[in-house]
Amino acid sequence: MSDRPAARPWGKCGSLCRREEIMVAFKGVWTQAFWKAVTAEFLAMLIFVLLSLGSTINWGGKENPLPVDMVLISLCFGLSIATMVQCFGHISGGHINPAVTVAMVCTRKISIAKSVFYIAAQCLGAIIGAGILYLVTPPSVVGGLGVTTVHGNLTAGHGLLVELIITFQLVFTIFASCDSKRTDVTGSIALAIGFSVAIGHLFAINYTGASMNPARSFGPAVIMGNWENHWIYWVGPIIGAVLAGGLYEYVFCPDVELKRRFKEAFSKAAQQTKGSYMEVEDNRSQVETEDLILKPGLVHVIDIDRGDEKKGKDPSGEIAQTQH
């Protein structure tokens, strides 16, 4: 006899089921529209990083540095993202931010498979955009290439909280501006998002560099090899984005149909936890009665005529008392 274990009869079926699950998860990935969207995210991030990081270059160099113009930097970042959203929003949704993409996954607006490609394209675009800026900028003034760093007088925890807050306000603005259920939004959605980015920069440039976008921090970090506290610019924005998306989508402005389906699901779950009851015959006595026994749990013998409850035995055979 062979020592080789016998193959399970459902082995092929299980393998087939797994393949089908993968195909369902990646449904829509192998389409022309999908790859256009991924390319749009890549190109939008490349242009955004190239233009916005260019505003952080100090052309005075290390010897004669010019004063940092926070208004210039804030407006450049805000107007750049607004322009990219206006240009590519109808193609890919205009995420241009891994934190926004994660928030969209958590609110079931895009699939996990799609988000993986989006985030990869965003990070690649950020690297290439930062690389192009590095190549076209004189070495004497390139400086840190806009790498985001936490202020020296702040701890990593402070930086994390600041990034969480400014990303929260950005993503909440995105969800509120793009809500298809609203009829009162008459202005430019792209401009509203751009203003939100600008506000975040005006507040937080001196604190953390005001990233709000993991890919924006990832690109220059790769080019310059500076990874100090880099994790803050992933964890903070993603937590802030998920909180903002979840609060808007499920608390402040929930979808009526989604709310109804959630309520039905919770109702069914509650009914299942109560247990199922069935009418059975009482074989403990030779006297014919109209007693009703309820199972599972303690066995209750209820006299229907008198409306009171007699002592019964639980399934283990011990006398049981039920209090109401």
UniProtKB/Swiss-Prot annotation:
GO terms for molecular function: water channel activity. One of its GO terms (biological process) is water transport. Phosphorylation by PKC at Ser-180 reduces conductance by 50%. Phosphorylation by PKG at Ser-111 in response to glutamate increases conductance by 40%. Isoform 2: Palmitoylated on its N-terminal region. Isoform 1: Not palmitoylated. The chain crosses the membrane at residues 37-57, 70-89, 116-136, 156-176, 185-205, 232-252. The keyword Transmembrane helix applies. The modification Phosphothreonine is found at T289. Residues 305-324 are annotated as: Disordered. A motif (NPA 2) lies at residues 213-215. Residues 1-36, 90-93, 102-115, 177-184, 253-324 are cytoplasmic. Residues 58-69, 137-155, 206-208, 223-231 are extracellular. Glycans are attached at N153, N206. It is a multi-pass membrane protein. One of its GO terms (cellular component) is basolateral plasma membrane. It is found in: Cell membrane; Basolateral cell membrane; Endosome membrane; Cell membrane, Sarcolemma. Keywords: Cell membrane, Cell projection, Endosome, Glycoprotein, Lipoprotein, Membrane, Palmitate, Phosphoprotein, Repeat, Transmembrane, Transmembrane helix, Transport. The keyword Transport applies. The modification Phosphoserine is found at S111, S180, S276, S285. Aquaporins contain two tandem repeats each containing three membrane-spanning domains and a pore-forming loop with the signature motif Asn-Pro-Ala (NPA). Forms a water-specific channel. Plays an important role in brain water homeostasis and in glymphatic solute transport. Required for a normal rate of water exchange across the blood brain interface. Required for normal levels of cerebrospinal fluid influx into the brain cortex and parenchyma along paravascular spaces that surround penetrating arteries, and for normal drainage of interstitial fluid along paravenous drainage pathways. Thereby, it is required for normal clearance of solutes from the brain interstitial fluid, including soluble beta-amyloid peptides derived from APP. Homotetramer. The tetramers can form oligomeric arrays in membranes. The size of the oligomers differs between tissues and is smaller in skeletal muscle than in brain. Interaction between AQP4 oligomeric arrays in close-by cells can contribute to cell-cell adhesion. Part of a complex containing MLC1, TRPV4, HEPACAM and ATP1B1. This is Aquaporin-4. It comes from Dipodomys merriami. The lineage of its organism: Eukaryota, Metazoa, Chordata, Craniata, Vertebrata.
